[in-house]
């Protein structure tokens, strides 16, 4: 396969922006036309949540495709996809907070206590926002190695979001399960990277024990 040039990558990035924005703008027609179902608030919440999940899976798909096709420049698509994922997830949260619960903080607190899937979703959103904010090149340079450690949490988000979706549905668990399987399939090639920190901990503990002076 011919190596992608800068113009090709820029074109793909433009498609990411146009597609992500276009599907949001479509809501300006879909909501008044009643295309989101009998409960438009619930329909809007699900639409934005599933859109964020799709963007998350696409973000995780970039690296395997770049490696498989030997197209390193494709990596440049991860940042716009990740930022749009965070944007869609934020809108999903704001619709739930503002339109569904109408900023009733007492009701919000009760929902957090009763519904664990909301807590899971909020943890995932906070991680996405942290990743989005620190994707600024200046912060990347200032954070150094800590930047990569933080951004490895995208893999945790990839599991939290399908679980949030699965726990939130009252019926029809098959679709969330498919998303969870897809997320696991995308994480499987990265298993060595994901398990490396856990394998280091016993080694560090043994090394520390070996360095302790023996008592007389």
Descriptions of predicted regions:
Residues 1-216:
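Membrane-embedded alpha-helical bundles that constitute the cytochrome b-like, heme-associated redox core
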